[in-house]
């Protein structure tokens, strides 16, 4: 599938993550604390002291907060959900973390050019209505030589892999049933293949892309050229 087809295919956002739905999501993902800590450590290994980091679609802010605990980084999060921006701000204040969360669209980031050293987008890219525009925006706000990391579900994740993933979340029976259904009948349908990510990366301004595979998803590493734009 060509990048132009991918852009038209994704002409929706799915359910708006506001109010009670956002609260339900935050409650369940809070149980993934170990995953957020591990992801934060992987990212911190890529960062110099004082690095400026952007999380696109941080949701309740759990990953950004764990990353902020690991070093003197300048952390910013942009999410389209006002509920998530409020939650993330409250969670950061409770953790005594200096991080800024603001409302905005991944396809029109309310940020200046060449501001960040590193960008991460976890479990959200498949929901963007304009994925190629979002990639271009990530490139725009990265400094020369900066990196971006997209972590997301793969569209061929098996039912067994999904079941195992949900089991590891240790949810209650109702929440586990709903989460399995959402993964299998909503999120997997929106997710991309390895080839999809490779084509989008090739069509983007990024100088280099490396894709790492796991049973449930992909880590897509993108690098901006070190040449001044």
Please name every model-derived segment.
Residues 126-127:
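A short His-aromatic
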Residues 32, 151-204, 210-212, 217-220:
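C-terminal alpha-helical "lid/dimerization" subdomain adjacent to the S-adenosyl-L-methionine
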Residues 54, 60-108:
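Class I SAM-dependent methyltransferase SAM/SAH-binding core
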Residues 120:
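A conserved beta-strand element that flanks and buttresses the S-adenosyl-L-methionine
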Residues 219-229:
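C-terminal lobe and adjacent flexible extensions of AdoMet/dcAdoMet transferase-like proteins
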Residues 132-144:
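A short glycine-rich, Lys/Arg-flanked "PGG" loop and its adjoining helix->strand segment in the class I
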Residues 52, 146-147:
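Short glycine-centered segments of the SAM/dcSAM-binding site in methyltransferase folds
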Residues 1-48, 66:
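Conserved class I S-adenosyl-L-methionine
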């Amino acid at each position: 599938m060509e990048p132009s087809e991918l852009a038209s295919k994704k002409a929706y956002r799915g359910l708006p993550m506001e109010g009670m739905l956002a609260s339900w999501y935050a409650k369940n993902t809070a149980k993934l604390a170990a995953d957020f800590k591990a992801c934060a450590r992987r990212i911190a290994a890529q960062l110099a002291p004082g690095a400026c980091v952007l999380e696109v679609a941080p949701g309740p802010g759990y990953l950004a907060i764990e990353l902020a605990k690991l070093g003197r980084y300048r952390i910013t999060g942009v999410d389209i959900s006002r509920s998530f921006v409020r939650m993330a701000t409250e969670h950061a204040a409770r953790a005594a973390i200096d991080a800024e969360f603001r409302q905005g669209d991944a396809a029109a980031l309310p940020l200046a050019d060449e501001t960040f050293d590193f960008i991460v987008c976890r479990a959200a890219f498949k929901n963007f209505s304009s994925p190629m525009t979002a990639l271009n925006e990530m490139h725009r706000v990265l400094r020369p030589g900066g990196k971006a990391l997209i972590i997301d579900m793969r569209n061929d994740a098996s039912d067994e892999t999904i079941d195992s993933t949900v089991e590891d979340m240790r949810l209650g029976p109702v929440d586990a049933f709903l989460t399995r259904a959402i993964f299998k009948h909503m999120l997997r349908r929106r997710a991309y293949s390895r080839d999809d990510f490779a084509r989008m990366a090739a069509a983007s301004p990024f100088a280099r892309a490396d894709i790492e595979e796991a049973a449930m998803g992909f880590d897509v590493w993108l690098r901006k050229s070190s040449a001044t734009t």
